[in-house]
């Protein structure tokens, strides 16, 4: 390995800085004649990067109060427009949706998503449409979700028995670990016809840590993404960590592929998701899916399918434990509709308006993705009289929209009843009502929206109905701090002691009846 002399390194850095400044001056001169949205000035070269801090969604929300619902920031050498209100989000994600349907290049897509060969980061085009279509048909769509409802019910049966056993020895429940175990097994059964984790322990903890690390790293504002000329330096060490993490996931996915292929004879007549995808690698739409595409898709589904929904459930339980009257009110509704002689089942959900209101309130106050995955403008455009240059990144502050005092009364309070009022009762979280867009909206709305809503409502409802919850004796108060990432995690995981409230035999079977 050749080591460059320090003088050459210094000269290179100076050259890059001068080049960037010249390019910026040229660009600024051409845009100055046009009306960009307001925003902070930022620093030379690095722009507004230092202003974002460790909690970018919070920093951007504060800036929006000063500069307005549509802001323009120079982040490094890249332009970024931020939408912070429902109307602003609607303008970008509905009116200008097609112009903002691509993703900007970034290190996460390159180093962790097989060079954007997945569904999340793939360019808007035939391959993305095919991956989306196959995922909806065989896993994420309404009919597919019905087909694997028994998998969700059986896995929750395993979870309830484990929690019941823990309650009898006074063992505390670590909510995030419990949810990761259950949800990874649900997804594993649908995709691979197997529970990927048979027992809690080192293996599942390592997987959870990998998922959390991926979602955290993917949410970082990596300097190299915004100043491509110095990306090779990896000043924050982020790309090095991404490559190391990708190797772990690739080893895991390779192992899953090999085990799945070895058991193909056992699935004759009962194909799973991976079987369907492999059978449709060559298709009439002219796209051929490589093994890399399929690995990348499985990575999307495993990580997003476990981490995002589990974070919303954990936040909902946290808010309810801080507000016991909400917990009791939810249990009373369930006792009237379901009783205590059977388990909670998915078909109960439409009959439980207060539970659904709790879930919506959790999605509002604690969206799993505080900032939508960035999009980029394919062409220059105009919005509300503002000029948006080509190749401008778009960030929608979903967290800020959910806490907008012009939209929500007492937005910092957890009040499920707000969704039972005439004003908000018809607001849904499926991408059409821009006051509540936890999954985004438009063409690039989260492909797992339906699954995410079902998972949160069903699992949270089961946990509320099946147990009484309290804090461990050594915990005086609940920590409500956030940790920023692609998914908004609790800084301190929720731990609780549970007490069964149903008949003993209900906890002993994986079947819902």
From Swiss-Prot:
It holds the Pfam family p450. CDD domains: CYP75 (cd20657). Gene3D superfamilies: Cytochrome P450. Keywords: Heme, Iron, Metal-binding, Monooxygenase, NADP, Oxidoreductase. One of its GO terms (molecular function) is flavonoid 3',5'-hydroxylase activity. Induction: By white light. PROSITE patterns: CYTOCHROME_P450 (PS00086). Signal peptide: none annotated. Its cofactor is heme. It catalyses: a 3',5'-unsubstituted flavanone + 2 reduced [NADPH--hemoprotein reductase] + 2 O2 = a 3',5'-dihydroxyflavanone + 2 oxidized [NADPH--hemoprotein reductase] + 2 H2O + 2 H(+). Pathway: Pigment biosynthesis; anthocyanin biosynthesis. Catalyzes the 3'5'-hydroxylation of naringenin and eriodictyol to form 5,7,3,'4',5'-pentahydroxyflavanone and 3',5'-hydroxylation of dihydrokaempferol and dihydroquercetin to form dihydromyricetin. This is Flavonoid 3',5'-hydroxylase. The gene is CYP75A2.
